[in-house]
Curated annotation (Swiss-Prot):
It comes from Allium textile (Textile onion). Its main location: plastid. One of its GO terms (biological process) is photosynthesis. Belongs to the PsbL family. The chain crosses the membrane at residues 17-37. PSII is composed of 1 copy each of membrane proteins PsbA, PsbB, PsbC, PsbD, PsbE, PsbF, PsbH, PsbI, PsbJ, PsbK, PsbL, PsbM, PsbT, PsbX, PsbY, PsbZ, Psb30/Ycf12, at least 3 peripheral proteins of the oxygen-evolving complex and a large number of cofactors. It forms dimeric complexes. It is a single-pass membrane protein. SUPFAM superfamilies: Photosystem II reaction center protein L, PsbL. Keywords: Chloroplast, Membrane, Photosynthesis, Photosystem II, Plastid, Reaction center, Thylakoid, Transmembrane, Transmembrane helix. It comes from the Eukaryota. One of the components of the core complex of photosystem II (PSII). PSII is a light-driven water:plastoquinone oxidoreductase that uses light energy to abstract electrons from H(2)O, generating O(2) and a proton gradient subsequently used for ATP formation. It consists of a core antenna complex that captures photons, and an electron transfer chain that converts photonic excitation into a charge separation. This subunit is found at the monomer-monomer interface and is required for correct PSII assembly and/or dimerization. The keyword Chloroplast applies. Pfam families: PsbL. This is Photosystem II reaction center protein L.
Amino acid sequence: MTQSNPNEQNVELNRTSLYWGLLLIXVLAVLFSNYFFN
């Protein structure tokens, strides 16, 4: 993990993809909870 090359775009892309993944997991968790509670 050398910081000789500033990959700010890659870090920002990974961060946004991580946030989208967490949002998707949350949405799926809500959908599954509603499906199981019905």
